[in-house]
Amino acid sequence: MTVWPGLSLAAPVTAVATNKFLDSIGVVTSLPDRGQPLARTIEMVRYCGFRWVRAGIEGLSDEGPTTVQTFLDLHRETGVRLSWGLVSGGTDVTKLVKTGKVLAEAGALLAFEGNNEPNNWGVTYQGEKGGGRESSWMAVAKLQRDLYQAVKSDPVLANYPVWSISEPGAQRDNVGLQFLTIPPSAQTLMPDGTTYADYANVHNYVYHPHSPSPADNKTWDAADPTAASRVDGLFGNFGVTWSRRFRGYAQDRLDTLPRVTTETGTYIQGPVTEELQGLNLMNLYLAQFKRGYAYTSVYLLRDRTDEGGNQSFGFYRPDYSPRKAAIYLHNLTTILADRGTLAKPGRLDFEISNQPKTVHELLLQRSDGTFQLIVWGERLRGEDRVTVKLGDMPEQVRLHDPTIGVEPVQTLSNANSIELTLSDHPIVITISPRMQ
């Protein structure tokens, strides 16, 4: 049993199972229908350590090149699970449910997802148009309602979560998509009690017209659930909608609202260098998880080769060579690697003295009982010096820097005070407690 009998510094912090954080790390990817061979996709997913992939019925056919078997093979070879969505403009709920059952029976299904950004890709559902340039979103609302009901009425699928559409903040009429379930007296066009989803879904890209430049706390602020966030975040989609200012949840409810991100990321351009992109994406997964996002999917695994525009979002270049983002994430997931289960995470007594607003922490625990305290900085320039104090004298402490590699950069014995110099990336402190 792990014990910490030493001097109490503060209220001990309960850890989160390392696997729970690793399971949150997802990605958007091209597949054979967009010219990316499955074998290369498997190779890239494995290297980075992704645990889930955002997917759906767009581009899916019985004849291929992308079939249900493509996704089953991806799951079998990498262990990833799949969020399964209607994607852009899709309306075929029957196909979504049918193919989702195949994935579920193989253990490959993570969740169902509603339409992708209906403000950009409208739908025609049961003869009614909605979203896009239409004046009403009623068709979008009815489609999402029916998707939810179809999943929850199926005995195989009922326990799988349904994620909302993305961009409900763009609604042109108040059909209530800013709620998971429309509450009483909400004064929406759809009736009170209409249920759309189990999780809110946002596309909170780190760089946004209201926040276009690199800055301190860039990913931390993008994950902010309050009105202080200057990107397309939770508040502007489920608090007060950004387009027509329809009222959604109060802040105290937003703080605990189950939520996911199915698209975020950054492309390389101007002041956003390959190095900064790599740091942003690594910090992003940490900030999202710490601030309540159960799952986060970054756009994009590899740069698109079948469309124009800025194609430098990828962890990989078009020639399949890894950018720094891929290398840094590989190092982080390798350092944290854990495939075991931890029924009840323990608690660690620690404090960070002189902690500025650009320094954040996340306490994890592996299935073998080892604590992994991740402390990261989000400074654009300069450094912060902090001291991590432990309430007990651990047997050994190892410090890892994922921007350098996977091996420890420092090992300490019988040390309960750790000096850190932080700038723009995480340090993983692996703490091996004394056993008795």
Regions found by a protein language model. Name each.
Residues 4-60:
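Boundary/entry segment of secreted carbohydrate-active catalytic domains
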Residues 349-395, 402:
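Carbohydrate-binding surface patches
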Residues 265-338, 343-356:
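Aromatic/acidic polysaccharide-binding cleft in carbohydrate-active enzymes
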Residues 41-43, 52-109, 131-165:
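Aromatic-lined substrate-binding rim segments of carbohydrate-active enzymes
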